[in-house]
Amino acid sequence: MLLSSSMPLNLGKRIFGYNSYLLTDIIIYHIVINNKWIQYFLGIRLIKAYVPCEKCSYEKVAEYENFKITHNLFDADVCIDDPVLFLKRIKGLEDEVTCLLWGDTVYDALYYKNEMAKYDNVIMASYWNYQMFEKLGYKIKGVMKRHIKPIFVGEKKDKIFVTLGESRYFDRKNLTLIDKITREFGVRDKTIIIGNLGNPDYPTFQLSEEEKYRLYARSKFFLALSKSEGFGIPPIEAMALGVVPIYLDAHGYKENLVGIPIDPIDEYTYCVDNKHCFRVWDLSIHELRYEINHALTIGKDEYEDLSEKAKNKARGYIIATMESSDFR
């Protein structure tokens, strides 16, 4: 991944003894200007994080950081949200909102340029989202990756594939395709689909964290075929356990996953009812079939090498301590 020299990044710094992906300057600046530094440092005051939903991925992000969740964005220190929807929501209220927006999106921001507020207190979770908003003239302060909080469990590898995702407005996660392609290869019974489409075996947000990780651990490969991802936490969670992703090599996946990539064949804006417009990528079904067959016939040495690389990559996303986060 090529990084622009103009990007305000300083990776690998440490803040209060913990590894940080983001500029410590951003975090300290945000805390100091709100006159809360001493309280955070002493652990007296929890960081309040606004999330726009319940039982959703943004809520999980806040939980992994040990933030105190609020649904009042005017009372939040950090806002974990889709930046397109957030900036549309606060238009006209910019002077009343002070939170540091930590965002990722699958929407095509260009389509909503005139509907979004101008707001400079923003960091992104992925470089492709950073570049998307930079092109629109936003002064994004930096990039901080999402974190995971894995549970290391031991399970017999009795499944080949697993996937997890919730598709809204259209099948962005390609769950129906996963159901179809695994049936085509006669391995649907060796596949776990956690989601809301594709004849799912489990619903998305009704599993405990341990149950979710046990399903990951039972599988050899994670099918990460989403047409678009602002970041993409589930395959990274699976990677922490050595599960190898077979993934569309685009959007947030391109910078975050290691495993078996599938090249995208097209990139475009897809609109649902002329209201919800997403930046999406298609994949080659022919190449997908090739890589599914590759996974089914892979040798032990090759698999173990890919599995180790996946685990090594995922280590960079594990929060340094369960008592703190990069925002302290």
UniProtKB/Swiss-Prot annotation:
GO MF annotation list: glycosyltransferase activity
Record bears the keyword Ribonucleoprotein: no
Check the record and name the Gene3D superfamilies matching this protein: Glycogen Phosphorylase B
Alphabetical keyword list: Glycosyltransferase, Transferase
Record-linked InterPro entries: Glyco_trans_1
Enzyme Commission (EC) number: 2.4.-.-
Family named by the database record: Belongs to the glycosyltransferase group 1 family. Glycosyltransferase 4 subfamily.
- This protein's name: Putative glycosyltransferase 41
